[in-house]
Amino acid sequence: MADKITSREADYSQWYIDLVRSAKLADYSDVRGCMVIRPNGYAVWEKMQAALDRMFKETGHVNAYFPLFIPESFIAKEAEHIEGFAPECAVVTHGGGEELAEKLYVRPTSETIIWSSYKKWIQSYRDLPLLINQWANVVRWEMRTRLFLRTTEFLWQEGHTAHATPEESQEEVMRMIRVYKTFAEEYMAMPVIMGRKTDSEKFAGADETYCIEAMMQDGKALQAGTSHNLGQNFAKAFDCQFQTKEGVLDYVWATSWGVSTRLIGALIMAHSDDRGLVLPPKLATRQVVIIPILRGDKAAVLAKAESMAAELKENGIPAFVDDSEQNSPGWKFAEYELQGIPVRIEVGPRDIDKGVCIAARRDTLEKTELQLDATLAVQVSGMLSAMQADMFQKALRFREENTREVTDYETFKSAVEEGFVIAHWDGTAETEEKIKEETRATIRVLPEESDYREHYHMDEPGVCIFSGKPSSQKVVFAKAY
């Protein structure tokens, strides 16, 4: 119940943990750094999977599955890649009671094992493009973990594609980061800034990394998805060449892109409140709960509630009836607010006599009187659509209200404690690192979207807030998860 949840104002971090556990989304495991995703949480992941998988297939991708274990020699082939991931890797040294001749890495990501197969499959330009996605688990040995946001093992999808030209691979990189942006905004109701990472923040082994960044309710950023242009780096490491249309051998051009169960953490922190989870309707497995007020003719009330649920389900709205008598209606209201059911409908004998029922939206808690007639499904569908749109607009307003443009470092240091900061940067890794050391803020993204760039005059020349050197553009700074 909500009384088990610390308020956001009192302790935001504890609020998040309390909510995840109280809403039965996830729990700690006896395995250090790992979590158990409970049915309520996994249901959200399944909705995310279904939407993303459909979007991947609509853009020409197919699913496959590659081994969990990666030979050490494969990892070592891409020097920058192994340098980036080595500290996080789990390594298998024994199997079948004997020491292995070659160590096996538990995948932190699958570029190397996948490219060992691509080398065998790609011979000619006729084999390209190769567009494959994998749904899998990965392991990164995290020292400081937090449910959904950072765990040693997590679930994700990773796309790996091969192309004949650098132009095609760059098109793929941008196509997929736009898919992620569409998913975040249209399904998660979470506004994101799409753009490029700095060289210091890009993926190990990539030429360029693009990302989507979202603002959480505490003003911190959360990287919600990435898409990497790998150039020919992995193709060269695994000698993956193809014969071009001109009959010349060339290395293929590659991309990789992924999102993970981290999105569930983002969803929670972007929308939820002190009463519990607030779920966008598009990601709710159960969109409507009907609570019969069992007074007077109980049988008639139950029959009406069941017929309402049936009507909603016939119209594509997942609804269910809670007719249990061991808990009061008030207890049920609080429990389903905690679980984030988008719409609650209560109906009793007086309501039936008047031909109405009372519906409440989870995001606003506002109550609305609905007519108990043939338009019930249309009325509820309208509530769900309005809720989805309103949640996005609320999150967008919050981001705008908590984004500041600053021109001096002293103001920057205080502003970055409260939200996103737009400021000039001289383009050097040295300045980027010094700002990070002093404030724990990082450059989250170099925005690509023209409307965002125009709104904040990102291309105006100026001077770097830290070094005072000339700067050709502004960037987005924030503290981050």
Curated annotation (Swiss-Prot):
A single GO molecular-function term is:
ATP binding
Write down the top EC class of this protein.
Answer: ligase
Q: Which GO terms describe its biological process?
A: prolyl-tRNA aminoacylation
Where does it reside?
A: Cytoplasm
Gene3D superfamilies associated with the record: Anticodon-binding domain, Bira Bifunctional Protein, Domain 2, C-terminal domain of ProRS
Q: Keywords in UniProt for this one?
A: Aminoacyl-tRNA synthetase, ATP-binding, Cytoplasm, Ligase, Nucleotide-binding, Protein biosynthesis
InterPro entries according to UniProt:
aa-tRNA-synt_IIb, aa-tRNA-synth_II, aa-tRNA-synth_II/BPL/LPL, Anticodon-bd, Anticodon-bd_dom_sf, Pro-tRNA-ligase_IIa, Pro-tRNA-ligase_IIa_arc-type, Pro-tRNA_ligase_II_C
SUPFAM superfamilies in the record, alphabetically? C-terminal domain of ProRS, Class II aaRS ABD-related, Class II aaRS and biotin synthetases
The source's domain of life comes to Bacteria
Q: Recorded E.C. number(s)?
A: 6.1.1.15
Quickly give the catalysed reaction: tRNA(Pro) + L-proline + ATP = L-prolyl-tRNA(Pro) + AMP + diphosphate
Spell out the family assignment given in the record's similarity comment: Belongs to the class-II aminoacyl-tRNA synthetase family. ProS type 3 subfamily.
Q: Which PANTHER family match?
A: BIFUNCTIONAL GLUTAMATE_PROLINE--TRNA LIGASE (PTHR43382:SF2), PROLYL-TRNA SYNTHETASE (PTHR43382)
Let me see what the UniProt entry remarks about domains: Consists of three domains: the N-terminal catalytic domain, the anticodon-binding domain and the C-terminal extension.
Quaternary structure and partners:
Homodimer.
Task: Describe the task this protein carries out.
Answer: Catalyzes the attachment of proline to tRNA(Pro) in a two-step reaction: proline is first activated by ATP to form Pro-AMP and then transferred to the acceptor end of tRNA(Pro).
The name this protein carries in UniProt is: Proline--tRNA ligase
Gene expressing this chain: proS
